[in-house]
Amino acid sequence: MAEAVRRDWQVTVFNRGVHGRVPDGVHRLRGDRTAPDGLAALTGGEWDLVVDTWDGAPRAVRDAALALADAVPHYVYVSSGSVYAPPVAPGSGEEAPTVPADADGDDGDYPANKAGGELAATRVFGDRALLARAGLILGPGEDIGRLPWWLNRVARGGDVLAPGPRDLPIQYVDVRDLATWLLDRGAEGVGGAYNVVGRTGHATMGDLLDAAVAVTGSDATLRWTAPEPILAAGVEPWNDLPVWIPRGHEYRWLQERDVERAYAAGLVCRPVTETVADTWRWLREVGRVPDRAGRPARAPVGLAPEREAALLAALPA
């Protein structure tokens, strides 16, 4: 929404209207897409483009797409790389098999919900549906808290458990670069599935954490540690140490997807230093990672201080 407003587009949002506010000039339609007649507010409207981020029951995407079938020429569905069926080989592209899903399905697990949402959007809009399989999303406004956790931890200073190797490539997309690509390609009428995330190695764990030290002005010392002792201590990649997935891990493919199709379609990713600096600026403005409005709470990410201290104490001097 912020990128569309920045472009001076006429923007309409559809939601229940019980959380947050919308920028001046944005028209809000109220409704509950899971309720009977909950899409009534869409009746009679016409738009140039729809962007749907729904991650619940696929039938809600189906119903919204059907309600908008004659009101909009193009449907953008923000999906996820989680739709791919395990095991996923590193380097896989959009042709990789997806998890079993049903366009008419009720709320299930996240991969099936997103895969079902893709089926629903495609059933109604065909090749006029753009399926953006986003990867790890970082940047200002991140309400999961992965990069904010690292920034807050580094800002506290002292020895920081830095999961290695330092040159481990990471794969993510800045939310603003994702938004730009979605609106550009949506306006052009592009359809089909795309892995929308930066190239593996656009940045490394070292680049990310060095940038965190720089922007916070912290006296933190990054204690780079090989994966083996970290994993042996029961630390979970991705959750306990956000962003980090070491080589050889079953979910390493999340950091090694083929994204050349999205790049050929104009994806441009800003430097990691900009993403980190702008996220820190936003985090200082809001004070803490905001609650996920209208969505189930997620388990907190990041190691507890006492657990990190114990791990650091066990490392060789």
Predicted regions and their residues:
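N-terminal Rossmann/SDR dinucleotide-binding element
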Residues: M1-T53
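NAD(P)-cofactor binding segment of oxidoreductase domains
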Residues: G45-A101, G105, A115-A120
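Conserved sequence/active-site signature of Rossmann-fold short-chain dehydrogenase/reductase
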Residues: V83, I137, G201
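Active-site YXXXK catalytic motif of short-chain dehydrogenase/reductase
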Residues: Y110-K114
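Conserved beta-loop-beta element that borders a ligand/cofactor-binding pocket
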Residues: G117-G141
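Substrate-positioning beta->alpha
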Residues: I144-W150, P163-E188, G192-N195, D207, ...
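A short C-terminal helix-loop "cap" of Rossmann-like NAD(P)-dependent dehydrogenase/epimerase domains
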Residues: L151-P163, S218
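Mid/C-terminal beta-alpha module of Rossmann-like enzyme folds, strongest
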Residues: D184-W253, R257-E260, D278-W280, E285-A317
